Amino acid sequence: MHSSTKKAAEPKRLTKNGKVYGDLLSAEEKKKLVLQKKKAKKTKKVRQSAQQTIPYVEMCRDGICKVNSRLYTKTIRFNDINYQLAQNEDKTAIFENWSDFLNYFDSSIFVQFSFINQRTSISEFKKQINIPEQDDEFNDIRSEYSEMLQNQLTKGNNGLIKRKYITFGIEADSLRMAKAKLDRIETDILNNFKTLGVKTEPLSGYERLKVLHDVFNMDSNEPFRFSFDMVARTGLSSKDFIAPTSFDFREGKCFKMGKAIGAVSFLQILAPELNDRMLADFLDMDSNITVNLHIRTIDQAKAIKSIKMKITDLDKMKIEEQKKAVRSGYDMEIIPSDLATYGGEAKRLLQDLQTRNERMFLVTILIMNTAASRQKLENAIFQTASIAQKYNCALKRLDFQQEEGLMSSLPIGLNQIEIERGLTTSSTAVFVPFTTQELFQSGEALYYGLNALSNNMIMVDRKQLKNPNGLILGTPGSGKSFSAKREMTNAFLITEDDIIVCDPEAEYYPLVQKLGGQVIRISPVSTDYINPLDINVNYSEEENPLTLKSDFILSMCELIVGGKDGLQPVEKTIIDRSVRKVYQDYLADPVPEKMPILEDLYNILRSQSEPEAQRIATALEIYVHGSLNVFNHRTNVDVNNRFVCYDIKQLGKQLKKLGMLIVQDQVWNRVTINRAQHKATRYYMDEFHLLLKEEQTAAYSVEIWKRFRKWGGIPTGITQNVKDLLASREIENIFENSDFVYLLNQASGDRQILSKALNISPSQQNYITNSNAGEGLIFYGSTIVPFKDDFPKDTMLYRYMTTKPEETLQN
C-alpha cells in the first residue's frame, strides 16, 4: 500500500448532464431532514442555564458516564504512532489491524473517535523548558541556553495540545449491568490498541471532566479545580465545575461559549475514493479544531438483506427501463448510466460483505472550529473547507443545529446529529488516526532538536527508558560531537548527573573548562596521572570487590603480555594471586596513601619463583621503570569533579589501547561510587570504534552496556563507523542494548546496514541521506522521529561546542 491509502466510499450521487448535485436522497429522507431543521429552529427547548445544556446525567469516579436514562459510556485516551513515514508493509499491517479493530464493534456498541487540537497557554510550555538560576557561576550559560529553548519553542506549535480519544457506550437498565460489559469492552479495546503498538490510558471520571472543562473553557487559563468530595460537600453538580460562563446559540450558523466563538460543520463525502491523508491534514492545522467520528455498526445480516433488497429494486427498475426501450423501438441494452453504475456498485458491495470481511457502518463526521474572534473563526473554517475540497469532499455548516453539533463534539458518546453516511470497513478505516509521534516530556527532559514534520520541540529524558544506553552515529561533519556536547551541556545545567568523556581527539576540553570541569591529559610527558589500580569498596556487587578488579587487571595484562595467543591459564592464576596480595594492606586500612600502584604488582610478580611470573613482570617493566611509565603513579588529579574529560590524544600508539582500557575502569570506579549516592553517571566515548577494534576494550565495552543500567550509568558511543558496531555477535549486543540512537547523515553503505538493523523505511531514510549537519532520525525506545537542530551560531555556547576549525574557541 502506498503512502496514500485509497478505498472505495460507495457514494450514491445524483448526476445530471455530467454534473454532481450531491448525495441521492429519497423523498422520505428529504422530508425527514426538513422536519429536523424545522424542529431544531422552531421547537427547540430553551435551557435555563449553561449546566442544563451539557447533555449527561452523571459522571462516576471510575470514568463511567451516564449520558441518559439508558446510555452509559467510557473514554480511553490513545497516543500516536508513526504511520505516515512507516514502511509500506508496516502501513499495510497498521491499516489491516485498524480495520480488524473497527470490525470488533457490533451493533450494540456506540463508538466515537474524538481528535481535539486545543491551544493552551504558551507560558505553561515555557515553564517546562525554563532553566532556573542556581547559586553558582554558570547562570550566564543557563540564561543563554534557556533563551535558545524559548526561541525554538516559537518555531513549532507546542502551544497546541493534541489529544486522541475513543469513547464507547452501551445501553443498559442500570449502572451495575453496564459496568461489567463496559469493562470487558475496555479490555478488548486496550488489547486491540496494543496489537497496533499504541499506548493507551483509560480515563477516570475526574480526567473525563477535565477534558470537558478544557473544551468548554478554552478562552480561559483557569485551571480545573474539582474533586468528587466537593460534589457531596457543596451540593453542586459536576457540571457546575466544567460549564463555561455562558452558551449562546442564537445565530444559527455559529455559537458562543464564554468569550470563544465556534462553529460545527459536518463532512459531506462526495469523493469516489477516500484518502488516508485527509484526517491527518485536518489535524495538522495550526488552530483549535475538534474532529469527531461517530460510528454505528449495522448488523451484518440486516446489512446484507438491505443491499439484496436494493439490488432487487435496481433490477426491477432495469427491467422497466428495458420494457420502455422495447416499446420505443430502442435497443433494450441501452439503459440509464446511473442505473448501471448503482447496480454494479451494489453487487460489489454485497460481494465485499459476504466474502472480504467487510462490514457496514453508519458514520457521522463532525468538525468543530473555535477561535477568539469571528474573523479568526472564518479563516479557520475556510482553511478546513479547503482541505475537504482538496479531497473531493464538502464542509457543510450545521445551520440551526449548532447546539446539537457542539454537544455531539464532546467525548461523551452522544450523537445528536442524524446525518449519517454508509461506509464499509475499508472506507471507514481510511480515517487512520495516526500520523507521527511527538517526543515532549517534562521533568529532566533534554533538548534534541525540532520534530522535522511538525516543528515541535523534542524533549526527552533518557533515564525514563528501560535501557538508557545510547549511540550517536553519523558521517564526519554531520554534527556528532556537537550533538553530544549539547546533550552534556543540557544535562549539566538541569540535572545533578556526573559527566565523563573519553576524548581521543582533544575536542571537548574548551567546553569542559568553560563548565568548570577537570581535563585530564594523559600522555608519556604529562604530569596528569591516573592509577589503574584504583579501587573502592563498592567496586563490585559482591562482598569482595577484588573479583571484578582482578578481571580488569587480567584484561590489562592480556593487552600488555598476551600477544596472539593471550594469557595462558598458569599466567592468569599467577596474576590473580598477585592481585589479591597487592591489595591486602589497602583493604585492611583503606586510606589513599596505601592504594597500590603498578610497581607494587610488578614487585610481587618479581618475588615469585615461577618463570611465568618473571615473564609477566618483564613485560610490565617498560610500564613501570621504562619510557611508558605514565600509569605507574597514584592518581593526582580531581577525578571526582562533576565533569571530567580524559584527553588521550597524545598517548601514542603504544599506550592508546591501554589508556582507553584504564579510562573505562576509572569510569566504572566512578559509577560504583555514584550508585551509592543515588546519582547518575553519563559516560561519552567519542571515536567509539577505536574501543571496539581491540578484543579487551571491546569486551569491556560490551560489559559496560550490560552492567551500567542497574548501576545508574548512561553510556553513549559516538562513531562514524557503523560496520564496527556490527563486527561480531558480541559487539552487536551494544547495538541491540541501546534504546536511544541519534542518527545523523549516513554514508550509503552504513545507511543500508542501519535500515535493515533498525527497520528504517525509505521515507525515513530521506532524513539521513545527504542531510545537513544536525539533521536525522532519533530513536527513543520504540518511537522514531525525524529531527533538525539549527543551533544559533551567535551564542557563546556554540563557539565552545563547535568543532569547525574556523569557528572553534580555544581556551
PLM regions: where:
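Extended, folded cores of ATP/NTP-driven motor/assembly subunits in large transport
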Residues: 1-434
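P-loop NTPase motor domains
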Residues: 81, 88-107, 114-118, 281-283, ...
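Hydrophobic anchor at the beta1->P-loop junction of P-loop NTPases
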Residues: 472
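Conserved lysine of the Walker
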Residues: 480
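Hydrophobic positions on the alpha1 helix immediately C-terminal to the Walker A/P-loop
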Residues: 483
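Post-Walker A helix-loop "phosphate-sensing" segment adjacent to the P-loop in P-loop NTPases
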Residues: 490-500
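A short helix-turn-beta junction within AAA+ P-loop NTPase domains corresponding to the substrate/partner-engaging
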Residues: 516-520, 730-743
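Conserved P-loop NTPase
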Residues: 758-811
